[in-house]
């Protein structure tokens, strides 16, 4: 009986460890490659949550009138994100018929979900605009009670440092640009690298180095099964993909 209990306990421990160590799936711009969805739409967020993604990634800009909107490209339907007002931008339609959302609309919809919110602040034309954007994002997230579900990513080194400075202690902040070593990221206070797949193909040793330093590792945008398999075998923490269902299958297998 004692042996059975020991074996059962060991199995439970191993099972728990396995679940913790399992690579997590992040839907790139939400789950948009499905009916009724579009990149960076509220539908894409809800659909990412509905299929059980760990996280749903989305992109944020600060408009000319200091409002926050959700969109990827600097120009959408001939309108500049930085040079247009929020009223102009939110009048534009996404591919699924939704209007381009404000960050507030997006986050309010997110309150109905459980998925982690992976917010990418786009690199802006001036550092002071990025600082203002970070301040507004952090304040809005606090107001909506979503601090524990937020993770921040950005290509801007300045914005990375501002998120680390202004977000609550312990909030994961990842750098996207692929230029810093694990040691440099650790010294800066980052949660880890969120680099393009090609960076880890050049520096596969960085994944273990990050883990040895207590950092987490994310790779983007990984859509091919062979690349998913390679990263999973390297024990990467997160993979960002346009093919979340395919990646979920690879993680399970």
Q: What are these model-predicted stretches?
A:
Residues 1-24:
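Bacterial Sec-dependent N-terminal signal peptides
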């Amino acid at each position: 009986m004692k042996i059975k209990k020991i074996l059962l306990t060991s199995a439970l421990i191993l099972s728990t460890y396995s679940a913790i160590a399992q690579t997590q799936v992040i839907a790139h711009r939400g789950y948009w490659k499905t009916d009724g969805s579009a990149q960076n739409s509220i539908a894409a967020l809800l659909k990412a949550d509905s299929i059980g993604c760990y996280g749903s990634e989305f992109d944020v800009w600060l408009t000319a009138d200091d409002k926050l909107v959700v969109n990827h490209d600097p120009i959408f339907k001939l309108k500049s994100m930085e040079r247009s007002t929020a009223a102009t931008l939110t009048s534009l339609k996404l591919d699924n018929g939704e209007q381009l959302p404000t960050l507030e609309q997006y986050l309010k919809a997110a309150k109905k979900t459980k998925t982690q919110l992976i917010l990418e602040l786009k690199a802006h034309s001036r550092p002071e605009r990025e600082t203002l954007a970070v301040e507004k994002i952090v304040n809005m997230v606090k107001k909506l009670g979503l601090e524990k579900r937020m993770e921040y990513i950005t290509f801007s080194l300045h914005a990375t440092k501002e998120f680390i400075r202004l977000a609550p202690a312990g909030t994961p902040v990842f750098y996207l640009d692929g230029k810093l070593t694990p040691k440099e990221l650790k010294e800066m206070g980052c949660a880890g690298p969120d680099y393009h797949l090609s960076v880890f193909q050049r520096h596969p040793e960085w994944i273990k180095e990050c883990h040895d330093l207590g950092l987490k590792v994310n790779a983007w945008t990984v859509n091919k099964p062979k690349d998913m398999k390679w990263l999973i075998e390297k024990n990467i923490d997160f993979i960002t993909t346009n093919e979340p269902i395919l990646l979920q299958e690879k993680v399970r297998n």
